[in-house]
UniProtKB/Swiss-Prot annotation:
Pfam families: CysS_C, DALR_2, tRNA-synt_1e
Protein name: Cysteine--tRNA ligase
Any GO BP annotation: cysteinyl-tRNA aminoacylation
InterPro entries assigned: Cys-tRNA-ligase, Cys-tRNA-synt_Ia_DALR, Cys-tRNA/MSH_ligase, CysS_C, Rossmann-like_a/b/a_fold, tRNA-synt_1_cat_dom, tRNAsynth_Ia_anticodon-bd
Residue ranges annotated as motif 'KMSKS' region: 270-274
UniProt keyword terms in alphabetical order: Aminoacyl-tRNA synthetase, ATP-binding, Cytoplasm, Ligase, Metal-binding, Nucleotide-binding, Protein biosynthesis, Zinc
NCBIfam families: cysS
Iron found in the keyword field: no
Motif 'HIGH' region positions after renumbering to this chain: 32-42
Residues that bind Zn(2+): C30, C212, H237, E241
Family to which the UniProt record says this protein belongs: Belongs to the class-I aminoacyl-tRNA synthetase family.
Cofactor: Zn(2+)
Organism: Maricaulis maris (strain MCS10)
Record carries keyword Lyase: no
Length: 461
């Protein structure tokens, strides 16, 4: 079996994955800031790293992989949302955290092993800041505690930026209490109407970068195997996480592998709330099965940009119809216990090459469709389901997928008969009969789609 290779942003190349302890593989991924609904761009890292989570658990064992994805529940945007709504911050954060879990669950995203909340880790954050102050890597100024970027000589290595160039290119007004424009906030004073906690520097709250460093250390250790997130987090968030964690831990690396997924775009623009070009997962799942959205997010390599369009979703649905059409035709054949086929695994082990894995999945669907004996069908069905499951796909009931579960048996038998008649007419090139049967099916509100594995149909509302 091929080894797992992953593209490490720090090394700027693919590397064989070698966990520090195969009995305890650790992964931390930056999760949502819960002040509003998640858009489909926010769902991309959730789906990407859920897929990696599945791969790692298959390689090392379900109980040997510890995956932490945090919840940021203290933030300027959260505070502003609470002010505008007149609701307590705790109500805002718990409400949107619940919706986030439900929306991601609809996309087949499994829950992480650990879901730490920032506000549950204030003592750890204060302790890390104290450590940085005592060791000369941070300083107090005007009620703030800031990280002294000049004290960490490798700052900018992850994002491949030069510190002097960053300082020279600073275009925003620099706070007077900063020694350098590049210094960033570890702890900030809290206003009377803002959430705050007592600290050696007065009542305040943590900076965003500090939160992830403290939570990662608390639950996974000083050096973890994998740290992931969107490419927009490389700088400044992950760069700052590295600086404060390495300096707090006497030079120990924060993570051995840094993984970043590409942007989701609408046209030529990155999808973002600030640009107002977002599509909310909460809305999309009203019009599409969550599996369609998940599949669409996997059609491009995770490091590449992905353009989100209605055409992409239409193609994705047709692709899933082909897979479920094969599973439906296999009917009552019980899937044989099967391992994931090697060619499919090879694609996933090559830096999560999901486009290649999806291509292999359709090869398996074709094999299942061509199987003749019940033994061959059972084996092919088992392999198809095992591979699809690695991607979080193909686990729904085929009849439910096509909207057939509530059909009267007599009506279903009639439709099946019409489908067979139309297929026979098409094979005999009797186009008038085929068209006439299709008209009958349209009158019954039946949508027929023809594909390489045969025709599939669904009952329309």
């Amino acid at each position: 079996m091929t080894s797992l290779t992953l593209f490490d942003t720090m090394a700027r190349r693919k590397r064989d994955f070698e966990p520090t302890d195969p009995g305890r593989v650790t992964m931390y991924v930056c999760g949502p800031t819960v002040y509003s609904y998640a858009h489909i761009g926010n769902a991309r890292p959730a789906v990407v790293f859920d897929t990696l989570f599945r791969v790692l658990r298959r390689l090392y064992g379900e109980d040997q992989v510890i995956y932490a994805r945090n919840i940021t529940d203290v933030d300027d945007k959260i505070i502003e949302t609470a002010r505008e709504s007149g609701k307590p911050i705790e109500d805002i954060t718990s409400h949107y955290a619940d919706i986030y879990r439900a929306d991601m669950g609809a996309l087949g995203v499994t829950l992480p092993t650990i879901e730490p909340h920032a506000t549950d880790h204030i003592p750890e954050m204060i302790g890390m800041v104290q450590n940085l102050v005592y060791s000369g890597h941070a300083y107090e100024a005007d009620g703030h505690v800031l990280f002294d970027v000049s004290s960490y000589e490798k700052y900018g290595r992850l994002s491949n930026r030069d510190l002097d160039d960053m300082i020279a290119g600073a275009r925003v007004e620099v706070a007077s209490y900063k020694r350098s424009p590049a210094d960033f906030v570890l702890w900030k004073p809290a206003k009377d109407d803002e959430p705050g906690w007592d600290s050696p520097w007065g009542r305040g709250r943590p900076g965003w970068h500090l939160e992830c460093s403290a939570m990662s250390e608390k639950h996974l250790g000083k050096t973890i195997d994998i740290h992931g997130g969107g490419t927009d987090l490389v700088f400044p968030h992950h760069e700052n996480e590295i600086a404060q964690s390495v300096c707090a831990h006497k030079g120990a690396p924060m993570a051995n592998y840094w993984l970043h997924n590409g942007f989701l775009t609408m046209g030529t623009d990155k999808m973002s709330k600030s640009l107002g070009n977002v599509q909310l997962v909460h809305d999309l799942i009203k019009d599409y099965p969550g599996e369609v959205l998940r599949y669409a997010l996997l059609t491009a390599h995770y490091r590449a940009p992905l353009t989100w369009t209605a055409d992409l979703l239409a193609k994705t649905r047709r692709s899933l119809d082909r897979i479920y059409g094969v599973l439906r035709r296999l009917g009552e054949i019980e899937a044989a216990p099967s391992d994931v086929p090697p060619a499919f695994l090879e694609a996933l082990h090559d830096d999560l090459n999901t486009p290649k894995a999806l291509s292999e999945l359709f090869q398996l669907a074709g094999n299942a469709n061509k199987a003749l004996s019940d033994v061959e069908k059972a084996q092919a069905k088992g392999e198809l389901l095992a591979a699809a499951g690695m991607l979080g796909l193909g686990q729904a009931d085929p009849d439910a997928w096509f909207g057939l579960t509530d059909l009267d048996p007599a009506e279903r038998a009639r439709i099946d008969d019409l489908i067979v008649r139309r297929q026979t007419a098409r094979e005999e090139k009797d186009w008038p009969t085929a068209d006439a049967v299709r008209d009958e099916l349209n009158a019954l509100k039946v949508q027929v789609d023809d594909g390489p594995e045969g025709s599939t149909w669904r009952k329309l509302d």
